[in-house]
Amino acid sequence: RWSKDDFFLALTQGVAPGGRHLYPAMPYTSYKGMSRQDADDIYAYLMTRPAVDVAITANEMPFPFNQRMALIGWNLLFRSQDPLPASSQGSSSQWQRGRYLADVLGHCGECHTPRGALGQMDLGKPMQGGDLGRFMAPDITPHGLAQRGWTPQDVSRFLGTGLAPQGSAFSEMHMVVDLSTRHLTPEDHQALALYLMGEQPPAAVPVKMGQGSDAGRMTYLDQCAGCHAREGEGKPHVAPAMRDNATLRQADGKNLIVSVLDGLPAQ
C-alpha cells in the first residue's frame, strides 16, 4: 500500500515506491507544481475507493524504450526544467488560480504544447498546439482562441458543458470535460477562461465568408446538411453548428478531415 509520501513523490517526481521510474506519460513534469495539500486530498479520496484486482500489463515498449533506467537521463534534462511559461498576461488572484488549474492540475500543456525531439514540452511555444497523432490539440493561446472565434464566456461554458457556439467537445477533449472540468465550480471555469484568454482578451475574430465552390456546396448538401442543416446552423444535441465551428477554422484542417473520414463515436 502506498503512503501519502509515496503518492506525492510519484505525482511530482515520477518515482514509484522502490525507486521505479514512471514514464512521463504520467504528467509529473506538470504535477511537480502541485501543492502538498492538493496531493494529500487526492490521496484521501482514492483511499475511499474500493480496491480492484487488476493485473498490471507487461511493458510492451520496444528496446531501448523499455529500459526505465534511461528515464534517469531524461529526468535530469527535463524534470527539473523551468515550469511551462504562462501563455497569457495577468496577475490577479483569479488569473493565478486559472494558471494553477491549467498548467498544473489540468496539465493542459501536456497535449496543447508542441514536443521536442526527446518528447519534452517545448517551453518556447506554450499552449501553441500539439500533435496527438490522428488528431491535433489546437492552439489555446489567447491569439489562437480568438482567431477561432472564442470569448472568455464561451471558453467557460465549454469547460463546464462541452458545448459552445464554436462546437462540442470530441475525442480526447470529451474525456477531459466528462471526467474532469465539468466537475469544477463555475468560479474555476471562469478562472480557467481568464487565464487561457488573458486579463485583456483579444477580440474574437468573426468568420470571413469565402467564395466556396458549387461542387463543395452540392457535396455538403448531399452528405452533411441532413444533420448539420442547409445553412450550417446545426441541430441542438444532434449535430453542432458549422457556421462558427472552431474545428473548421483551424489552419491545417487536420481535425476536420479526420472527423469526416473516421466519423466520431457517440459520446
What are these regions (language model features)?
Residues 73-76, 85-116, 121-129, 210-237, ...:
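Sequence/structural segment immediately N-terminal to covalent heme-attachment motifs in c-type
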Residues 1-26, 36, 42, 46, ...:
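Extracytoplasmic electron-transfer domains, predominantly the class I c-type cytochrome c fold
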Residues 31-33, 102, 145, 178-184, ...:
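Flexible gly/pro/ser-rich segments immediately N-terminal to CXXCH heme-c attachment motifs
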Residues 17-20, 49-57, 91-95, 117-121, ...:
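Inter-heme linker and motif-flanking segments adjacent to c-type heme-binding CXXCH motifs
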Residues 12-16, 31, 44-51, 103-106, ...:
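Sec-exported extracytoplasmic/periplasmic mature domains
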Residues 54-72:
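Extended, well-folded interaction surfaces typified by the phenylalanyl-tRNA synthetase beta subunit core
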Residues 28, 61-66, 175-181, 209-215:
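Short amphipathic alpha-helical linker/capping segments at the junctions of internal repeats
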Residues 22-31, 80-86:
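Short acidic, glycine/Ser/Thr-rich loop/turn "cap" segments at secondary-structure junctions
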